[in-house]
Amino acid sequence: MGEIARAAGVAVGTLYRHFPNKTDLLAAVVNEYVEALADDAQDAWERVEAGRSDAAQELLGFLGRALEMIFRSHAAKTVARALGAEVEYAEPETRATEALGRLIEEGRASGRLRSDLTVSDLYVLMVFYPGDGSPEVRRRWLELIRPGLLGHGG
């Protein structure tokens, strides 16, 4: 914890006041990523709802950003899981699922997304993404799955 406090530029006591141990600190880091993903999904829907963007474009953009977050959080999630850290997924997952569901519904209605696409499909794709991939791997992965997401009008 001392090394982490030095790197963060805070006193060790300050770090311990907020996070009693490394497991709690890692859980907080992973929670931040999960919350950020949910916020991003909601922001994407809000842009579509306000008429500032297209649902298919926002969904693909969200996936790209989500993959970047998956890459950045990969090590923290692995260590947190190994230490048995308690990560709160329920509330942010509900927010993300609702926002992504609205994006998909709008995209299907416009014909830009395939008519049978579901939020579960997106989650399956994200789970099987190789989280330690380079930017080139992420770009190629998105390029390969894009045709499977888009409808005939996409």
Q: What are the residue ranges of the model-derived segments?
A:
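Short, hydrophobic secondary-structure boundary micro-motifs
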Residues: 75-82, 112-117, 153-154
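Short secondary-structure transition hinges
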Residues: 24, 61-102, 127-131
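C-terminal peripheral helix-coil segments that are non-catalytic and often amphipathic
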Residues: 98, 102-112, 125-154
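Hydrophobic alpha-helical connector segments
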Residues: 28, 39-71
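Amphipathic alpha-helical interaction segments
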Residues: 3, 24, 57-65, 121-124, ...
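All-alpha amphipathic helical-bundle segments outside canonical DNA-binding/catalytic cores
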Residues: 57, 91-93, 109-124, 135-136
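Helix-turn-helix
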Residues: 1-24, 28
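Generic hydrophobic, amphipathic alpha-helix propensity
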Residues: 4, 29-33, 37, 100
